[in-house]
Amino acid sequence: MVQIDLPAESAVRIRYPTLTKKLRKRSTLVIIVGLLLLCIITSTHISHNFSGSDTPKCRSIYMYPSYARIDGFDSRHTKLAKKYHLYLYREQGKDKEPKHGDEIQLDGIPVLFIPGNAGSFKQARSIAAASANLYFDHKSTIQNSNAKNMDYFTADFNEDFTAFHGQTMLDQAVYLNDAVRYILSMYAQSAAYKESNRPLPKSVILLGHSMGGIVARLMLTLPNHIPESVNTILTLSSPHSTAPVTFDGDILKLYDRVNSYWTSAMNDMGSYFRNNVSVISITGGILDDILPADYTNLQGIVPESNGFTTFTTTIPELWTPIDHLAIVWCDQLRYLLAKYILEIVNDDAGGKTATLDIRMRKGRKFFLSGLERITDADKLIDKNLSAPAVDFSDTESVPENHLLVLNSSESMSTGYAFNISKSVDYSFEMLTSLVQFDIFFCKDIYGKDCINGFSSFSKVPHSTSLQKFPTDSSWGESVSPFRFISLNGSLLQGFQIIVFQGSMKKKEDFVLAKYSDDKSIETASDGLWKLSLFPFRMSLKNKHSFVHGLAFPNLWSSLISFNLKTTFSDEIDSMFRPMMRQYVNNPYETKWHLLAASSSHEINMHNISPFIPLDDTIDKSLNLMFFIPPGEEISLRLSINWKLTLKMLYIRFRLAFASIPISIIALVLCYQFYYYDSPDSKFISFDTGLMNVLNNHSLLIFLFLSVGPIAINHKAILTLLHYLDPISLSKPSSDSHMLNNNYMLGLRETFVWWIGPVFFIISVALLFIILRLINVIEFAVIKISSAITRYTRITFPDPLNDMTHHKLLFNNRQLLGVCFISLGVMVYVPYQFAFILVSLIQMWNCMKLAVFTNRNNAKYSNIHNYNVSFLMLTIFMIPINAPIVVVFLRNFAIRWETAFRSHHNFLAIAPTLLLTLRNSQCNIPIIKNRMNWLIVVSILGYLSFYSFMYGIRNLYWVYHISNILNGVLFFLTIL
């Protein structure tokens, strides 16, 4: 094929692109590779089962639920009373049930559960039942003298699709603010409160699941929010940092508004937010296949003084990943959530919660491993200094850098003492299987002014040959977890001696402790490029220590998973089996791996991720912390796990299967219109255009896809891309250390250069599959049409011979349809619904033209090729518009009679509607001059560029650019 410039005269012969045999072979190879990649990613996503620490281990639950509908919360109190409802959960046999069948008794502290996308109000029952059981049956285990039973209210949103529709999310937030106002007023009428003279509640604890967590944060930004009515928010699998789908512009605008509002409020040191409001985000991690766990990060929105993000694998005595739906009913988690809530309430205060400092300290205790830097401030803070009941003269002194090993009752003396050096280079570490013991940190060597440090110990999984998973020693199991503490020199400043005392009641009990200046963390410089060729190998052995740290500062991408093989001798009579803590410092993700003599462990992390803001000052390392019995030697082999890597690509780049194909279609249309530069030109077919684009420009395309996503990771380029974006919702951070890449694929690591080409090849294969499906349907229609003509002698009139279609812009039937659809969009239905109807019309246009093209190819070839290309673009616009249609139909199904209060812009569908109707008359855009041609090609080029550069995070705007294109094409059909 020879490329030429635009001809000066129409008489110049043009060599149009054709499908040569060589070109077909090349294109077939690309399609086969694309289909193979698609099959590999799909099969790994479906068939690959998680193992080890990623195995789901939630226990089943039971409860005795009942729900009291709050009928008094009607249209007098909220305009949304006919659409939504409010319920009060009551655990049968525990909570006070309504008197006389309808008189609700409130005597506790209010909690409001907010369901997520398509969620049910009944999902509150698991945590509500756990709270009731814990308070009424096990109150002695609650470390809070001001605890009170909880009243769980739950919102019934009729399983609304919150994630798809911004107006729905806004409606829910408005309704819930009205609900909070009504709930607080109910307590003012409560007989129990009147009789006890207790302070009336002035705030409500919010518990949100999935999008319910975003609705909770949105509530505090609205005009109808009651000031200081919310100070505690707990969210489960809620995408705080970025919207999980980008089909609706209202959702993106709400996200931008909410996050900007919260960031500003939290940066104001004197605001109510900064001094009172806490947010804890809990995610299930790798098992969440509904939304990427990366999106739950609060970094940059809420400071660590007010909240944090944690993973269920991090939480002590939970230690299991949880999927998106199970996170509301997982037995271990619901118990910990219920216990946390009961320990942070204060029935004697009007706000009904403890101070922000107490809530955050309790939050770190319950939901972090205790080994994070942020938890250091919570250790050794007991203000009640006292003298321990230990005879210090009878203790055995343990020298510095000496490992204390106790593994039998005969080896225990009265106590063991560690003298503390003034140097901050020393640290103290201790691991034990004992359930109860005393350890005192004293400010003088005589045992006065001491703190009992037992509560500063962290619980870690019990690891012996009998345990296969970390959850084998989680809450509710018969095996108790180990306890571990690590204190650096700065935390020990002010103390002079550590005294340990305990008794071993079991044969397998042990104690390991050491006060030393040994540096137990080694750094491995291996990066992904080296690791892809040569696995990392290392042996760990130290007779004088039991903790070994290994940091990989160059392994930080969440997109790459690893495989760690461990080998050690199982012949040594060890006190415990070696185990490993895998962790990153932000967000707070920890996974525990119990090691076998020869075992393989999958390493997947949520660290630096696409589209998530990055603080370049934080430690990004992948860290491995090994607990090894003294004398044991472990061999390590770390390599890339390609199977798990491919599996995890799908959940992070699902939207790319819409944006990249649209980019390719626009590029092919641009190529087609490049040659269709006059009324006498030939409009080449879609497959011819696509194959020639691949043949002539594949090198340039692959170079752009490989280098582009990585090259833009510079603050100046990101700022430029922001200003080139016509909607510009993702504003560059004012913090010079924050980097937010919302463009292309959001990649940051050069090693993943191949992701762009992979998705491009898959997208090409998808386009050919869809094109062939259209061809098959057309073939069937042609056969049916021929059969009808043969047996009934009914002939279909040739539309190009009917001169009336040249005289009239639209016929009467089309005008009636335009008026009907226009009125419907402006009054009741969203324009997306009209788009689905238009898509069906365009499909019919192509089927009709296939019949006429079969009769007279020369006459109808251009029109048919043009309509098929337009149909391809229309098909990939359907996923962008379908979610809003689903929301609309859901509202219609529940008989919500109020008009759909968004997406009634008739101009958002008019160009596409009018062009489709012109297509049905067998009209094709007429390129009369170079300016017409330049406008069409420029818009198509921009659509292709925008869809790839900005499309994943702004899919809704891709549709609007396409709609503008359709308006231009419609104008060209009437010239």
UniProtKB/Swiss-Prot annotation:
Q: Which PANTHER family does this chain map to?
A: GPI INOSITOL-DEACYLASE (PTHR15495:SF7), NEGATIVE REGULATOR OF VESICLE FORMATION-RELATED (PTHR15495)
Query: What EC number(s) does the entry state?
Result: 3.1.-.-
Per UniProt, subcellular location reads as: Endoplasmic reticulum membrane
Q: Which GO terms describe its molecular function?
A: phosphatidylinositol deacylase activity
Q: Name one Pfam family in it.
A: PGAP1_TMD
Cite the SUPFAM superfamilies for this sequence.
Answer: alpha/beta-Hydrolases (SSF53474)
Which residues does the Swiss-Prot or TrEMBL record annotate as the active site? 210
Q: What is the annotated role of this protein in its UniProt record?
A: Involved in inositol deacylation of GPI-anchored proteins which plays important roles in the quality control and ER-associated degradation of GPI-anchored proteins.
Query: What residues are glycosylation sites in this protein?
Result: 49, 276, 384, 407, 419, 488, 696, 867
What family classification does the UniProt entry report for this protein? Answer: Belongs to the GPI inositol-deacylase family.
The membrane topology term of the UniProt record is: Multi-pass membrane protein
Mention one GO biological process in which this protein takes part, according to its record.
Answer: GPI anchor metabolic process
InterPro entries the UniProt entry points to: AB_hydrolase_fold (IPR029058), PGAP1-ab_dom-like (IPR012908), PGAP1/BST1 (IPR039529), PGAP1_TMD (IPR056824)
Q: Keywords of this protein's UniProt record, alphabetized?
A: Endoplasmic reticulum, Glycoprotein, Hydrolase, Membrane, Protein transport, Transmembrane, Transmembrane helix, Transport
Give the domain of life. Answer: Eukaryota
One cellular component term (GO) for this entry is: endoplasmic reticulum membrane
The species is Kluyveromyces lactis (strain ATCC 8585 / CBS 2359 / DSM 70799 / NBRC 1267 / NRRL Y-1140 / WM37)
- Transmembrane regions listed in the UniProt entry: 27-47, 655-675, 699-719, 751-771, 818-838, 868-888, 932-952, 955-975
Q: Give the top-level enzyme category.
A: hydrolase
What is the name attached to this protein's record? Answer: GPI inositol-deacylase
